[in-house]
Amino acid sequence: MFRDWPYLYDAEETGEVGYMRQYAEDPRAAVVLAFDGDRVVGASTCQPMASSHPEVRDAFAARGLDASRFCYFGESLLERAHRGQGAGVAFFTEREAHARRLGLTQAAFCSVVRNPNDPRKPADYTPLDGFWRNRGYVHHPDLACRFHWREVGDDRETPHLLSFWLRTL
């Protein structure tokens, strides 16, 4: 699902397994799943920011923000056929509840920054900004980090800017 706009992420399974291991090995992390019968059709992750990626922690430290107060919301992936049926709202509700149980007072996630005129952008693409604002999140474009990944069609990883959305819980 990350192969689609705006991420255009071309993942190798070995890298994804290693990435997901950080959630599996963190007793304070959570993975929320969406099912259609017995089949997983979506997943969403979170963990205390203090346990998260150095790129995320460093962005907050550079701004004088205390990472120990934040829950970092990682991925939210949902098959296209199951969107618009409440799973996205449930992903946020469950992760926010998990953060509160951990005693965390803030939630944060980041989204990739793309040129709105990029020719690879599908004509029917609808950004999720409105959905996130309806959940109470505020965009902070000046709070950002960089992650490296290989885009679909590329042969090497390149840096990508991601900006943060925050909410007090």
Task: Please identify what each model-predicted range represents.
Residues 100-106, 113-142:
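Conserved active-site alpha-helix within GNAT-family acetyltransferase domains
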Residues 75-78, 84-101:
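Conserved acetyl-CoA-binding loop-helix of GNAT-fold acetyltransferases
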Residues 7-37, 45:
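Active-site rim helix/loop that mediates acceptor-substrate recognition in acyltransferases
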Residues 73, 107-109:
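Conserved hydrophobic beta-strand within the GNAT/NAT acetyltransferase core sheet
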Residues 166-169:
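Short beta-strand-to-coil "C-cap" segments at the C-terminal boundary of structured domains/repeats
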